[in-house]
Each structure stands twice: as C-alpha cells, then as structure tokens.
Swiss-Prot record:
Signal peptide: none annotated. It comes from Gallus gallus (Chicken). This is Peroxiredoxin-like 2A. The gene is PRXL2A. SUPFAM superfamilies: Thioredoxin-like. It is found in: Cytoplasm. Pfam families: AhpC-TSA_2 (PF13911). Belongs to the peroxiredoxin-like PRXL2 family. PRXL2A subfamily. InterPro entries: PXL2A/B/C, Thioredoxin-like_sf. The keyword Cytoplasm applies. GO terms for cellular component: cytoplasm. Residues 14-112 are annotated as: Thioredoxin fold. One of its GO terms (molecular function) is antioxidant activity. Keywords: Antioxidant, Cytoplasm, Redox-active center, Selenocysteine. The keyword Chaperone does not apply.
Length: 224
C-alpha cells in the first residue's frame, strides 16, 4: 500500500478548478456585454421635469424651477454624468457644435451637473457652450436613477467609446461620482412636452446629433 499522494488526480482537480474559474469569468464577460441586466430607464414626464429645483453656480446662487429653462423657447439640456469624464467632455463638445443651428432656431443649450467639486465645472465649460446649473437632488438623472458599476468596464462598447474619445484628443480625471448615468433632453416651449429623451445605457453612449436637431426644429416658441 502506497501512502504517497496521487499527483495525477491532484493535477486533474486543479485543472478542473482552473477551467471552472475561466468558464465563470468568460460567462461573466459575455453577460456584461448583453443588455439583459441593464436597468431600464423610466421615461420622464413633463410634470416631473417642471418641478425639478435647480441652482445657479454664480457667486450668489439662486434656486429656481427647471421649467424656467424652456418656458419661452424650449431647450436642449444635457444631464452630465461627471464633468471630469473625458467621454462627457466629448459629448458636450459635440452638442456645442450644434450651437449655431440652435441659435438660429432660438433654442438655448444648457447642462446640469449633480455636484460641484473644485474647478470641475469651470474646466468642463471649456467643452460646453451653454449655461450650467446644479441639480443637487439628481432629478434630471431620474425619475429612477440608474447606475453602471464596475461591470461597465467589461463591456466592449465602453472600451470602444474610450478609444474613440482618446483618439479624438479628449482627456479627463477621476474626480466626482461617475456611476450615475446621464442623458440629453430636448424639451418644447411651454407645455409642448418632451420631444427627445436620450438616456445613457453605458459609459459614453452619446445622443444622436441629427436627432437633437430634428427635435429642436419641432419646438414652437411661445408668444411673449
């Protein structure tokens, strides 16, 4: 009778454990790249957006209802996931490229941020040609706020977005909360309603610029 361990069985066992771990990792990556487990956005209503309280970012902050932004001429509003994010800076720059067309239509371009850290908003202003307001309750990121956590870094689309923004010369930092997903709204004047609502499904999921312009062209300014 031999008391020596059977290294063949031991080796096979280690291979089984290793293959199981690799299989689990591959399964996790595959699942992370499907939309099955992405939280679905709840569509905002005009009434919900109208009641949101925003704050100006000047030396004397003023709190006001968001409906002021689109009351007369409608508005295009970007809910910024994180001002220091290079993907957000890319989208802000692209939205700002529409400023000449929006100005011809008389439609203002705005952004909201959920926090103000250091000079992050001021730095973001280099990429965004519109006024920026603070949404402390993060209401423009709702009605049901959605987050993409670390699993987002396993998504192929996210890495494609990273590479695209990097190749286009954008850079950023890691300051602030960047997991709560943002979006873009085009809202008609007065009670006209929400003409476009784009909600990020993953980091760097940008709005279609032609869709923004198409929606903005439908805005009917209110008579003064």
């Amino acid at each position: 009778m031999s008391f020596l361990p059977d290294f063949g069985i031991f080796t096979m066992g280690m291979w089984s454990v290793g293959l199981g771990a690799v299989g689990a990792a591959i399964t996790g990556i595959v699942l992370a790249n499907t939309d099955l487990f992405l939280s679905k956005p709840e569509k905002a209503t005009l009434e919900f957006l109208e009641a949101i309280e925003l704050k100006t970012l000047g030396s004397e902050p003023r709190t006001f209802k968001a409906s002021e932004l689109w009351k007369k001429n409608g508005a295009v509003i970007m809910a910024v996931r994180r001002p220091g994010u290079f993907l957000c800076r890319e989208e802000a720059s692209e939205l700002s490229s529409l400023k000449p067309q929006l100005s011809k239509l008389g439609v203002p371009l705005y952004a909201v941020v959920k926090e103000k850290i250091g000079t992050e908003v001021e730095d973001f202003q280099h990429y965004f040609q519109g006024e920026i307001f603070l949404d402390e309750k993060r209401s423009f990121y709702g009605p049901r706020k959605r987050k993409m956590m670390l699993s987002g870094f396993f998504r192929i689309g996210v890495w494609q977005n990273f590479f695209r923004a990097w190749k286009n010369g954008y850079s950023g930092n890691l300051e602030g909360e960047g997991f709560t997903l943002g979006g873009v709204y085009v809202i008609g004047a007065g009670r006209q309603g929400i003409l476009l609502e784009h909600r990020e499904k993953e980091f760097g999921d940008k709005v279609s610029l032609p869709s923004v312009l198409e929606a903005a062209e439908k805005i009917k300014p209110q008579a003064s």
